[in-house]
């Protein structure tokens, strides 16, 4: 994650990105928050949510929607249907 730091990615965003990269599943924002708190106990839900939006806008993560269910986040940006 050091190279991300040199690009101006905060430690909070690095933690959120790490959680998503380490997961084998599509995570909701709440799930990302739960995992990120293990890496950075003081991180807030708002910070996680804003980090997810930033990382998505920078094309570092993908956003997956399954109908009316909660939005989920994925490290894999290639299209895949379930």
Language-model segments: which ranges?
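Short coil turns linking two alpha-helices in DNA-binding domains
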Residues: 44-45
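Short capping segments at the starts of secondary-structure elements
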Residues: 22-28
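Short alpha-helical segments that sit at the start of domains
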Residues: 1-18
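Non-DNA-binding regulatory cores of transcription-related proteins
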Residues: 60-82
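A short acidic, leucine-rich amphipathic alpha-helix
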Residues: 31-37
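Basic amphipathic alpha-helical segments that dock to polyanions
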Residues: 48-58
């Amino acid at each position: 994650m050091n190279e991300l730091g040199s690009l101006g990615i905060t430690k909070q965003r690095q933690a959120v990105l790490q959680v998503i990269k380490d997961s084998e599943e599509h995570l909701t924002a709440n799930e990302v928050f739960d995992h990120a708190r293990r890496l950075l106990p003081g991180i807030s839900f708002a910070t996680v949510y804003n980090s997810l939006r930033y990382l998505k806008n920078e094309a570092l993560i993908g956003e997956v929607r399954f109908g009316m269910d909660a939005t989920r986040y994925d490290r894999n940006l290639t299209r895949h249907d379930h």
